[in-house]
């Protein structure tokens, strides 16, 4: 592995890189996504626990082009209880190269044992389309702080361009501030979130 790649991964590990739409006040997050629609690297800064601003560099696999988006995410509602947490976000992005933009909502509810999440986005592009997914999961064991945590999940995605709904298994690992999510479907290939 080249020295540049090693330095890049070392840089990622030294940041607070837990995959989340908004970090704590003053926090930074770096995420990498790869699926059948796009591959991207995304960085955001959270001046407040209520919102984040960021930049996403991506390769659009459908329209075979690269672009950079400026992103904004706002925490509309959060509810913490003794046993669970619920989040609801507004998300948006605008292209730095053209008039393309994205807006949508993202939400989740989880306990230490169960997880439910959803995402809905409208994409204004060369051809406008909608992305949506639902994710359900459970933790096969309960770890304590600092342990490696594992989630077994099912993800269902539908995209208005492809007009087919696909459902596939996902496994999610996280420890400390690092998260890795892997899913696979033979029709869409790998779905990776780091």
What does each of the following model-derived ranges do?
Residues 22-34, 51-60, 85-96, 114-124, ...:
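Transmembrane beta-strand segments that form the barrel wall of outer-membrane beta-barrel proteins
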Residues 161-163:
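Short, charged/polar "capping" segments at the starts of alpha-helices
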Residues 61-95:
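Long amphipathic alpha-helical segments with strong coiled-coil/leucine-zipper propensity
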Residues 1-22:
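Cleavable N-terminal export/targeting peptides
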Residues 118-119, 129-131:
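A short secondary-structure junction signal
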Residues 20-25, 34-40, 44-46:
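N-terminal alpha-helical scaffold/docking segments in eukaryotic complex subunits
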Residues 38-48, 66-80, 101-113, 130-144, ...:
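Feature captures outer-membrane beta-barrel proteins of Gram-negative bacteria and organelles
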């Amino acid at each position: 592995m080249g020295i540049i790649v090693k330095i890049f991964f070392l840089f990622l590990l030294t940041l607070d890189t837990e995959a989340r739409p908004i970090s704590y006040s003053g926090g930074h997050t770096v995420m990498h996504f790869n699926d059948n629609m796009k591959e991207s690297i995304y960085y955001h800064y959270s001046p407040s626990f209520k919102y984040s601003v960021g930049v996403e560099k991506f390769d659009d696999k459908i329209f075979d082009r690269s672009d950079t988006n400026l992103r904004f995410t706002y925490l509309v509602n959060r509810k913490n209880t003794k046993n669970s947490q619920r989040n609801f976000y507004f998300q948006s992005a605008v292209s730095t190269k053209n008039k393309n933009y994205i807006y949508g909502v993202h939400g989740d509810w989880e306990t230490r044992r169960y997880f439910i999440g959803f995402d809905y986005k409208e994409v204004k592009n060369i051809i406008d389309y909608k992305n949506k997914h639902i994710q359900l999961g459970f933790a096969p064991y309960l770890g304590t702080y600092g342990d490696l945590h594992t989630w077994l999940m099912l993800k269902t995605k539908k995209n208005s361009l492809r007009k087919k709904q696909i459902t596939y298994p996902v496994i999610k690992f996280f420890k400390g501030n690092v998260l890795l999510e892997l899913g696979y479907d033979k029709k869409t290939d790998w779905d990776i979130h780091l």
